[in-house]
Amino acid sequence: MNPFKQELIKAEKKAEKLFKEIEIQGLLIPGITEKELNASIFNLAFELFSIEKYWHKRIVRAGKNTLKPYDENPENLTLKPDDILFIDFGPIFEEWEADFGRTYVLGNDMLKKKLALDIEHAWWAGKAYFDKHKKITGAELYAYCNTLAQKYQWEFGGEIGGHLIGHFPHERLEKEDKTNYIHPENKVDMRALDQKGEERNWILEIHFVDKEKEIGGFFEQLLTI
């Protein structure tokens, strides 16, 4: 394994530890707002790893806001006792980027719990599909993620199914260049080398929603390991 990928894996392991600590510290409680939870996680990340830099905006979304994709900036909701919420943070550990997303269910709603399980199972199914196909475009993987949503009886909620990840500061991911994303217009092999002749690394993100019930779930981590 090349040193570049090893650093990305180390960064992700730290992100995973941060997310576990969120639960251990009891930060996920009803009655607080999304912004308050966001600030608490920011403070926890600083205490654990001295993190102050994030390569994308920090996302905490609860209730109907879990329907919203990354680009939107919905109203600040208060967490309810039976809520579903997801957290999507992109912390930078010693100049290496992580991008980690998880979903949590505060109450005992079985449909919400099913959604939280389904997105994790779908993520691993997506990785297995990627690993099986030694040549695969972003469009092909995105289409498969949509097929998984149908299999689990949800709707795929994102315009993308993932993106490139790397060393900070990396070249900005231009939204107009779909080859940077797991996107229906990306016809390039995801395993193609970059302009420097180096391997590219990808994040896979699964966002399933039920628009009628106004719930969504999100699961995200490093794909190319």
Model-derived regions: residue spans:
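Active-site neighborhoods and metal-handling regions in enzymes and metal-associated proteins
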Residues: 1-225
